[in-house]
Amino acid sequence: MREISCNAIISSIKEMCIQATHYLSDDMKSALYKGVEKEESPLGRQILEQLCENLTIAGKDMIPICQDTGMAVVFVEIGQEVHIVDGGLEDAINEGVRQGYIEGYLRKSVVSDPIERVNTQDNTPAIIHYSIVPGDRFRITLAPKGFGSENMSRVVMLKPADGIEGVKKVILETVDLAGPNACPPMVIGVGVGGDFEKCAIMAKHALTRAAGEHSSVPYVRALEEEMLDKVNRLGIGPGGLGGTVTAFAVNIETYPTHIAGLPVAVNICCHVNRHVTKEL
């Protein structure tokens, strides 16, 4: 049995909140710089260059990349042989988020009730997804999610007869409907299968995959490549002002489903696709 202290979790989450909101991961920076080279529209290139400059300023002056520093989404992989000590795991995660957003001077964007809309003043609670794995591994992925792109996301319950063409249609329709409102260029997470909530969680988790890293399943990889090409042919472009770089990646996850269903979720993220992973 391996023991992990809540204090270590709090400290890690706090640091991850500040890191994720001030610095893009290397894969996203690379995708952005490559986008400048690929973009055919002069205006589109200008917008991408401004986004690159914004990254530089954020890192140099230690200010957030975007004013929407997101709602904290946390994926936890915890081994069966791990014992959390000195407190509760969920309390520790939320305390880490609280400290990170307060000490990092990050925008507090969470309200305590969806109808009454009273701000919690510390960006808690986080949205936490747990996965129990063998052994004594403890891995945390933090993904602060902004809601400009979140509001453009969808879950569609297709019929099995809709097949792969139906899945393609949902992806393209979702991106097309989002247009400039998702702050393109974007990363598109897709979940196919499971049930209503499982496909949505997969779509969210797909956003944490490195840009340019494809599925290990051959047909899924082919679908990712095809959909990225089709999305970029929509011509939405950077900032929604036209161009050839609408998305950097389409990441798809799948799961077994019921014989009567074909659930599809599309979770869109803007170019500020923040994700940090740490093992304790």
Which residues does each predicted region cover?
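Non-transmembrane, aqueous-exposed alpha-helical and coiled segments at domain scale
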Residues: 1-190, 195-280
